Amino acid sequence: MLSKVDIRQVIKQRNKCLSKAEREAQSAAILAHLANHPRFKAAQTVMLFSSLPDEVNTHAFIRQWTQTKRIVLPVVKGDDMELRLFTTEEDMHIGAFGISEPIGLAFDKLDEIDLIIVPGMAFDKEGHRLGRGKGYYDRFLSQPNIMSTYKIGICLPHQLVESIPTEAHDIMMNEVIG
């Protein structure tokens, strides 16, 4: 089994081989699958993420669904994440790590979140996730009032791997779309 460091290196190399057009086509297919997922259809409040260039491109998807669903996005605050309600592109700024973040008030009604969509460097078929190594999502998702919320990891097909080494603090996904 490859180490977490080795898997990250492999994924970074695979990312370099993917054209922008391929990434956009794959993103569209993954997000179409998500949009038709029964859990997404039923959800009123969805935690999504503002994508980085090497992730499933979520920007248009967020704008598309903000009219019919309450969309909340993570914002990095020191060593932790908090959520903010997405309203419009105009109410976004570039935050930590170059991530586009909402500038509005914090959303603290975590028990109202119906579905959590999670990015990752890699996922395996069992639902194990490999992040970027800072632990933001693992810390956030370990909060008691969202531990049982359904979590779907989304990634590009080349980010699906056979197996990811896990540690006790790693939070599993209920499902992975990639």
Range-by-range predicted roles:
Residues 82-178:
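Conserved phosphate- and dinucleotide-binding cores of soluble alpha/beta proteins
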Residues 1-111:
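N-terminal active-site beta-alpha-beta segment that forms phosphate/nucleotide-binding
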